[in-house]
Amino acid sequence: MTLLLLPLLLASLLASCSCNKANKHKPWIEAEYQGIVMENDNTVLLNPPLFALDKDAPLRYAGEICGFRLHGSGVPFEAVILDKATGEGLIRAKEPVDCEAQKEHTFTIQAYDCGEGPDGANTKKSHKATVHVRVNDVNEFAPVFVERLYRAAVTEGKLYDRILRVEAIDGDCSPQYSQICYYEILTPNTPFLIDNDGNIENTEKLQYSGERLYKFTVTAYDCGKKRAADDAEVEIQVKPTCKPSWQGWNKRIEYAPGAGSLALFPGIRLETCDEPLWNIQATIELQTSHVAKGCDRDNYSERALRKLCGAATGEVDLLPMPGPNANWTAGLSVHYSQDSSLIYWFNGTQAVQVPLGGPSGLGSGPQDSLSDHFTLSFWMKHGVTPNKGKKEEETIVCNTVQNEDGFSHYSLTVHGCRIAFLYWPLLESARPVKFLWKLEQVCDDEWHHYALNLEFPTVTLYTDGISFDPALIHDNGLIHPPRREPALMIGACWTEEKNKEKEKGDNSTDTTQGDPLSIHHYFHGYLAGFSVRSGRLESREVIECLYACREGLDYRDFESLGKGMKVHVNPSQSLLTLEGDDVETFNHALQHVAYMNTLRFATPGVRPLRLTTAVKCFSEESCVSIPEVEGYVVVLQPDAPQILLSGTAHFARPAVDFEGTNGVPLFPDLQITCSISHQVEAKKDESWQGTVTDTRMSDEIVHNLDGCEISLVGDDLDPERESLLLDTTSLQQRGLELTNTSAYLTIAGVESITVYEEILRQARYRLRHGAALYTRKFRLSCSEMNGRYSSNEFIVEVNVLHSMNRVAHPSHVLSSQQFLHRGHQPPPEMAGHSLASSHRNSMIPSAATLIIVVCVGFLVLMVVLGLVRIHSLHRRVSGAGGPPGASSDPKDPDLFWDDSALTIIVNPMESYQNRQSCVTGAVGGQQEDEDSSDSEVADSPSSDERRIIETPPHRY
């Protein structure tokens, strides 16, 4: 039997060896394949067909093809085996392909056999063949016009080869389907023709007297004869015979604050109707007189603006608001400007005399009045009065000053469009000097600011922040000197020395009322902000910062300014003049004239705009005339800044912290941020449930504040028990004003947000020792731009934690309210040991609070039961010899009470342990509190010691 099995075993071993060595050849495929797949289809047609051959065939496994592998990044195809024996395969797309996304795909393919057995061992792979698959286009897209509406204009009586061109595009990928083969006008009976390229021409001459606007519809066809999904509309306007004018400008120009420089006429061009010109002059005028005082300026108050610009202090207001200390302005007519500043109207018969010396005058005495170094600053609106002669002067200010050497005198007057400054250094010996300026601002009846710097013999006049040197300087030695007595008058001046005798009998009241014998040269116009600063001059930079206009016409494209072009801008930037000799160069220059407003929060509204043009032609007989252009700039409403106050809104501290010298900070972690929210375009594919009407985003900006207020929510402060504290030294160093009352505390003055944060974090709340206050709420709010923008109201609630052993209660009955406080007070028997614990855990979770209340209530119940038991015991012990005043009613023996002070003897350790067990069951992790309590329990009375418990007063 053994001999028979051996040959079988040897045969099986030989067969096994022969199978392992049967897979000798690799599969073979073509080196390259070309494939075609139709768009939106899966099957790829290959040339040649996909077949893999193996020389090991017909052996099983070794001669069979098990599959194909594709190699390449992101190949959207897959290869499948159709017949393992023949090696036939198929390439197909994983999903329908899109020709518009990708027209061709290239990758490699490799075949592999089934190896030497079912487990695929010793599998062999073929070489890698390259496969090129082209996606055949399907005419799935219709032509689409680039514009839905085409407009053009033609002049009457002309035939045009091309009026305009319409254009359509096709989204298909192949040239056959993506090209537009022809266009067609669908509207019948139109005098127009369109070619295959979309060019439209007129077939007859059009007349302005006939139809002035032609409307018709145009469609397009691709080379697959697919028509456009949406047709295009064409409008052709017929214009009359050419008239010289400006073309391509918009009447309304919108300006968004913060946009910088905005071109006013970006597409403007001059139509000359082929008339040759040799000179063109255009003037652009921007009208801003209706905006505040003549133009858009900083919206801060005068005082805040002086601080921002770095102006020195010490100026004296000569025309203050009428009041007890400034009664000299009471007789003038008072108005208010758009920025709420005070304006005085002088009607030509009024003047005011400013008192010298004293608390309400200029300086402490005449010797402190103006010297030969001073700055006069004022706003003036003045026009030429029709009923007054052009030769009559009007006095703005007239002043005679007494000094150590004698008297000096000066006056500032207007005379038509001239402004004059007369200075007499010394009436006794020196000759007067008169400085003259001729300015159109003086008589244009618009608001302008004037600042005059005197540093004799130098005098500089600033108008709207722009300096002007005197046009003429006269040595006037023939005029009569004024009377020698100190006086300061605004709106007129007194007569010369020869009339002094007539004036001696007149008092100051009569003088200011305008006695014709003593007062002359009255001023007719408006004055505001009239101040003087003696001994030191305002610098040019400060004056420019304070009063220069922040809006105006602008031109910066000097580099590309053509040859022969001239540009001139007036000092106030309200008038710009262009001059040139070439039309195209002139058009280019005018297209770069811009409006600019440097204010972040510009004053919204309309600024009228006017363009006037004068031309000179080679032929005067046929010279053209260019009509005036009028439009307006609309300054849009600026995005308001959002001032956000944030920080800790609620905190609790022990009473000893509030009773300290410095109190407790109210806003220790205050954060002030300023941001601007502006509208952005919402994405169309944005997932939003509902209707999207506005999408906004916020950009944080660096900004200033001009005031903050801390007020009380509820009753005012009681000065005898509480107060608000703030370091006045730091406020004075920064030029801020502090007002502290029982109802509020205000800080006024322009400073950065960082400085206000630092100051407000130092605001403290202090209590007097023993004050029984438990809760206070404070409201903080800030503002900016002279109160134009305000912050949110940030409310802080403060809890004062009192120890219950610090106060006494007159009642002998203990109640749950006497053991429970909003600040989570400890039980009275541990009041002296739980201050630190209550401070650290003033905010106990609500569940723990409920358990504590239950425990305390249980404790109170036990105390009440103890009282009843003590009372019964006391009755049995006392018997008939009770205390005086005891009840002797035999019907109600249990209602006997002792009128003396109630004394309760309890075990403090037992009640404290009961309460601690309740808290431990509700709130874990209070190890710190337990340690502090345990450390103090060691010093508490022992169980056999007695302790007197006094109930606290009821304060709720």
Swiss-Prot record:
Do you know which PROSITE patterns this protein is assigned to? Answer: CADHERIN_2 (PS50268)
Q: Which residues lie on this side of the membrane: Extracellular?
A: 20-847
Q: Which SUPFAM superfamilies match?
A: Cadherin-like, Concanavalin A-like lectins/glucanases
Its membrane topology is listed as: Single-pass type I membrane protein
What are the GO cellular component annotations? cell surface; dendrite; endoplasmic reticulum membrane; GABA-ergic synapse; glutamatergic synapse; Golgi membrane; lipid droplet; organelle membrane contact site
**Post-translational modification comment from the UniProt entry:** Proteolytically processed under normal cellular conditions. A primary zeta-cleavage generates a large extracellular (soluble) N-terminal domain (sAlc) and a short C-terminal transmembrane fragment (CTF1). A secondary cleavage catalyzed by gamma-secretase within the transmembrane domain releases the beta-Alc-beta chain in the extracellular milieu and produces an intracellular fragment (AlcICD). This processing is strongly suppressed in the tripartite complex formed with APBA2 and APP, which seems to prevent the association with gamma-secretase.
**Residues carrying a glycan:** 299, 327, 347, 507, 740
One term of GO molecular function: enzyme inhibitor activity
State the signal peptide span. 1-19
Broad class of where this protein is predominantly found: membrane
Could you tell me which residue ranges are on the Cytoplasmic side of the membrane?
A: 869-956
Q: Where do Basic and acidic residues bias regions lie?
A: 943-956
Q: Which InterPro entries match?
A: Cadherin-like_dom (IPR002126), Cadherin-like_sf (IPR015919), CLSTN_C (IPR045588), ConA-like_dom_sf (IPR013320)
**Domain comment, in the record's words?**
The cytoplasmic domain binds synaptic Ca(2+).
Function in brief: Postsynaptic adhesion molecule that binds to presynaptic neurexins to mediate both excitatory and inhibitory synapse formation. Promotes synapse development by acting as a cell adhesion molecule at the postsynaptic membrane, which associates with both neurexin-alpha and neurexin-beta proteins at the presynaptic membrane. Regulates the balance between excitatory and inhibitory synapses by inhibiting formation of excitatory parallel-fiber synapses and promoting formation of inhibitory synapses in the same neuron.
- Which protein family is named in the record? Belongs to the calsyntenin family.
**Can you state the subunit structure given in the record?**
Interacts (via cadherin domains) with both alpha and beta isoforms of neurexins (NRXN1, NRXN2 and NRXN3). Directly interacts with APBA2. Forms a tripartite complex with APBA2 and APP. Interacts with low affinity with KLC1. Interacts with SLC23A2/SVCT2.
Protein name, entry field: Calsyntenin-3
Name the source organism: Homo sapiens (Human)
